[in-house]
Design a protein with these regions (language model features):
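Short hydrophobic/aromatic beta-strand element in the GNAT-like acyltransferase core
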Residues: 10, 21-25, 35, 56, ...
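Conserved catalytic-core motifs of GNAT/GCN5-like acyltransferases
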Residues: 89-91, 106-122
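Short amphipathic alpha-helix that is part of the acyltransferase structural core
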Residues: 1-14, 18-32, 129
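Conserved beta-strand in the GNAT
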Residues: 25, 31-42, 53-58
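Conserved acetyl-CoA-binding loop-helix of GNAT-fold acetyltransferases
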Residues: 59, 65-78
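Conserved active-site tyrosine of GNAT-family acetyltransferases
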Residues: 100, 105
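Conserved GNAT acetyl-CoA-binding A-motif
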Residues: 73, 80-92
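A conserved beta-turn-beta hairpin within the catalytic core of GNAT-like acetyltransferases
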Residues: 41-54, 64, 117
Length: 129
């Protein structure tokens, strides 16, 4: 879950409607069970000029650990490259760092706190590696 127990409004982000933003979803029997959103957004501490931020990745608890998030990212990677970007970054929750490493992300720096959300790590994936 993205923000379990929080209003739906907390899952809406600035940039959701931008032209270069795209949203992916996995459906099982017509029900949306996993989502990922990609934003054309440069991180201030990463030099690569063109970047996408992965934000809002979530899977319903009953559908976690079935490869849905990995599948969404495998769809996202070529779309990002098609938009002439070769780097994706995210602020990974501490408990999700292992997942991101499995799909090729690398950690940068130290864990940091996002208020009300806990410890996170800046992670990047270079699509040309």
């Amino acid at each position: 879950m993205l923000f379990n127990g929080q209003p739906v409004k907390t899952c809406q982000f600035e940039g959701d409607d931008e032209d270069q933003t795209f949203h992916l979803g996995a459906f099982i029997e017509g029900k949306l069970v996993s989502v990922a959103s990609m934003y054309f957004e440069k991180h201030p501490n990463i030099e690569e000029p063109y970047q996408y931020q992965l934000q809002g990745m979530a899977t319903l608890p009953d559908h976690q650990y079935k490869g849905l998030s990995s599948a969404l990212l495998q769809v996202a990677f070529p779309i990002v490259k098609q938009n002439l970007c070769h780097l994706i970054w995210c602020n990974a929750r501490e408990e999700a760092i292992g997942f991101y490493k499995k799909v090729g992300f690398e950690g940068i720096g130290e864990l940091f706190e996002i208020p009300n959300l806990g410890q996170h790590l800046l992670m990047v994936k270079y699509l040309d590696k």
